[in-house]
Amino acid sequence: MSCDLHIHSTCSDGAVPIERLASIAARTGLHAIALSDHDTLLSAQYAYAHTGQDEVELIPAVELTGYDFERQHRVHLLCYYPDVDCPALREHCAIMKERRNACALQSAKELEQLYPQFTTDLAWETTKASGVLFKSGLMQALELLGLTDGSIYGETY
């Protein structure tokens, strides 16, 4: 049985809408995938509701962001079959959503200054599924505007 236990969708910083992941997994020969988006329960809820889509087992998961105080850096913890109604888990996801959006909005403001054709609204359009603006959404908006010729990433980020 082949599986991928760490897949992201457009519910976080992935490039593929969650509805398409099972069919892509089936075409590549996978029997199961864990939908493990960053700090959101949307993908776990989807997996619980669509267990055997396209003959691929959807495993509910979430990738939680934390901090290792001993080593002083961020860590990620994969949590499988989370309780999507757990108040503490929901609160963690809400806090991370707020933090990510604040950080991304600051980056979006800087991009608007550098590239007048770039708008924060366009970046938000790329993240409708999650309501969280990830760096990948900013990059996708830049790509839609033809601003990713290879040099922007190294210079701006």
Which residues fall in each region the model found?
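Extended substrate/RNA-proximal surfaces in nucleic-acid metabolism proteins
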Residues: 53-157
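An N-terminally biased module of ancient metal coordination in phosphate/nucleic-acid-related enzymes
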Residues: 1-72
